[in-house]
Amino acid sequence: MTDRMTDPVADPVADANRAGAPPIDVVIYHNPDCGTSRNTLAMIRNAGIEPHVVEYLKTPPSRAMVAQLAARSGAGLRGLLREAGTPYAALGLGDPALTDDALLDAIAAHPILLNRPLVVTPKGVRLCRPSETVLDLLPVQGGAFAKEDGAPVVDADGRRVAGV
């Protein structure tokens, strides 16, 4: 057994994923129409984890949850805003004078403004763009993985492909 006090590289997520260990809680704020989100979800499942999937356009997170996700991700609210295909410009959300409350109001009224996929694991919270970002939050993958477009991400031994 690894001593977490003396082994700085101990990986609690990988440890928990081993046979006989309790399941890992993973949440993905997901849009099934988004290829990046679908690839991220597939990588989570490739690690042997069935996450709690929140289709955030159908079931938007509360204002408090969005604020917490932004803080825990380190990206801040502006870092979680999606511009393309949203009312971002029409609402003037690029204005740096807007407060966090104003941004939260906009996200609550228009959940499409929340960028995706957001993933929560015991290792942290990340906006997984590109989708490979999720690998930093997961234990070793269960085998090879390629994105929908065929781009390899993980090799047959469950390791990230060089350059990814």
Question: For each predicted feature, which ranges?
Answer:
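Local sequence-structure signature of Cys/Sec-based thiol-disulfide redox active-site neighborhoods
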Residues: 17-47, 51-59
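Thiol/selenol-based redox catalytic cores and closely related redox-interacting motifs
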Residues: 56-164
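Long, low-complexity, intrinsically disordered segments
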Residues: 2-3, 162
